[in-house]
Amino acid sequence: MKKVLPLVAVMAGLFAASVQAAPEINLGVLGGENSTAQIGNNQCVKTFLESETGTTVNIRNASDYSAVIQGLLGDQVDLVLNMSPKSYASVYLKDQSKVELVGITTDDTDNSKGYHSVVLVKADSPYQKLEDLKGKVFSFADPDSTSGFLIPNNQFEQKLGGNMDNQFNGFFKKVGFSGGHEQDILGVLNGQFDAAVTWTSMVGDREEGYSAGALRKVKENGFDDLMSNLRIIWQSPLIPNGPTIVRGDMDPDLKAKLVAAVRKLDKEDHSCFVKAAGGKLHLEETSISEYQTVIDLVKAQQKTVR
C-alpha cells in the first residue's frame, strides 16, 4: 500500500527546497583601514545589481587580500570590481575555474591601463631617494598585494640585494607589513614608519591624490591636506591595472546576468562604479596576456618559497 503524504507536508517541503536553492551574489570588498567607508561606497553597486539580476547581493567585507582569495576559492565571493593583479594570479594558479576576467579597470583621464607602486615619506623628512632610507624603518602593505609587496619586493631584491627576511642585506633597520595601503600611508604620517609603499595612477591632479589609488581614497576620507604632507621618492615600472572578475564556476545563467549587469553599471551609473572601484576608472576588454607577467612572477615566487 502506497503511503500518501499530506498536501501541506509536500508543499512545505517544496517551499523549503526553493528557499534553500535561492541564488545569491557575494560582492567581495577589501575593507582595509576604513571598512565602513568601503561598504558604504559599494551600497550603490548592491542596489544596481539586485535590480538588474533579480538576485540578492551580499557585500562581503574582507580584512585583507588573502580573505578575498580564499573567498573565491571557497565559493564565498562571486564578484570583485577591482582586484589586485597578484591576488588574481594567486587564484588563477591555484584553480583557474574559480576566476574569470570581465575587464581591466582603465583610467578615465588618459585611458591608461596601468598604475605604479610608490615609496612614500613625510614631506618634511630629509629623504629624497631610495638610497637615503639606509638604516630606516620600512613597511610593505600586504603580502598578497601587487603594488604593496610583489613588485617593490622584486625591485628591491634586484637593486639592494638580499630579501625581506634579511632586510635586503641589512639595508633597512626593520621591514614589515602594515596590513594594507591605507595603514602604510597613515603609518608614514604618524611616524610609525620612515617610508612605506602604496599604489597610485600617477596621472591626474596630484593635490587630489591623482586620478586613482590609495592616496586618493585616504584624501577623500577626510585627510584634506594629505598630499602636502607626503613625498614620493620612488616609483615602480607600470603595473597592469586590477581586473574586474567573477567566480568562473558559478551558475552559468546567473554569471551571464552578473557580467552584463556589471558592464551596464559602468556605462549607466559610472559615478557608482568609480566610487566602488576606487578611482576614476572604467572597464575595457582584457585577456590573460595582460596579466601573464604578474602570473609568472607569482609562480616564480611560489617556487622560491617552496
Stretches found by the model and what they are:
Residues 26-51, 85, 109-186, 271, ...:
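Bilobed "Venus flytrap"/periplasmic-binding protein-like clamshell domains
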Residues 40, 44, 48, 67, ...:
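Extracytoplasmic/secreted proteins, especially bacterial periplasmic and envelope-associated proteins
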Residues 22-29, 33-44, 214-217, 246-306:
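An extracytoplasmic/periplasmic, membrane-proximal ligand-sensing/linker region
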Residues 22-89:
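Extracytoplasmic small-molecule ligand-binding "clamshell" domains
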Residues 98-112, 229-235:
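A structural signal for short loop-to-beta-strand junctions that line the ligand-binding cleft
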Residues 1-20:
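Gram-negative bacterial Sec-dependent N-terminal signal peptides
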Residues 73-81, 96-98, 137-138, 189-202:
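Alpha-to-beta junction loops
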Residues 143-251:
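Pocket-lining segment of extracytoplasmic ligand-binding domains
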